[in-house]
Amino acid sequence: MNKILKPINILCFVCLSLLSKQAHAADTAVLRIGFLLPIYNDSNSSQSQKAIGQAALDYYSGVKIALSRLQTLGLHVRVFTWDLNLKNDSTLIDITKSKAFQTLDVLVGPIDQKSTNTIASHLQYTDFLWISPLKQLNLPNTVNSLNFFADDMYRIRGLIGDLRIKYPNHDWCLVTPKEQNERVAVWINELQKAGISYKKVIYSNNKISPKPPRKEEVLLINAGTNNFSKLSQYKAIARKYDSYIVGDLEWYQNVMSIDEVDEKRIIYPQINMIYGLDSLTESFTKEFVDSSLAEPSKFAFIGYDQLNYIGLNFLALGHDFYHHFPKGEHTGLINNIQITKATDNQWVNTGMRLNQLEFIEVREIENEENSEQDKN
């Protein structure tokens, strides 16, 4: 099961800030936010275009639920939406010159580098926060920017910070394939920067060498290995009561259960994760289904989490909120958000979730039920 409990997020901070502030003037209390997303598709659209469009639509639907809920907390918002699939380069340039664009507090999108470059090369107004919501993009350094999905360096840096807090007494082993890769180099560099000592372990031919330390508290941290390698790693720590395997950043894309492995000892780092329904995700899912007549994808949850975070910060801190992002980690429905400054006016999200899963064998449960019926 997911071992992470949802802590009190920045909502408490927002409430305290709102109580301590005088009412803003009407023209300064409005969050003006624009969305540039590829939503529209028709019969001539390719399958990949349709998939991207559906993801963007789900994201935007999650955004609308977040904004609706934030309005009950007192948020005043003006929303401007431009559909990228109905625009060409010349109309994108026209958008940057429009009155609506010139007064934005936040711009969300596009989600491709080509459109981003077109807009960036024609910017006249730069006093806003430009957000890349679904992938790492090169945003211009002439504006304040936030990438919600960071590259390996920042993801690994965030993961190191989380592991350091949660497992302060454990010995660290970096498990790598025999053939070194770029991710291994990033791990080594970030571990050195953090001043963390570690033992290097090689995974090859379904074996790891050398063996982990004798200590009971050991972390086997994977860099560039495959999901199946956890079997040989688990054998090395099975008798250590407080040792864990930390999967590679890609493991959660293809989680598989291996009979000989106790999944409660495997940690899957992930930026976002849907695992079951607690009361908060269940409430969101119901509201999404009622409004969209479909189950929410992960993109709907991402849209909700991101805009909930932005809106709460705007409520608490005003128009220049992005210069004062809180240092604490915000736990959303499926995303942990930890904003880290990359440069003077560029930020990235380094929040990670440490997921531990528990697989339930349904067939065994059914057999037990049948046995009870036979007895009766």
Model feature map: region roles:
Residues 17-21:
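N-terminal signal peptide c-region/cleavage motif recognized by signal peptidases
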Residues 4-16:
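Sec-dependent N-terminal signal peptides
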Residues 2-5, 23-376:
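Extracytosolic ligand-binding ectodomains
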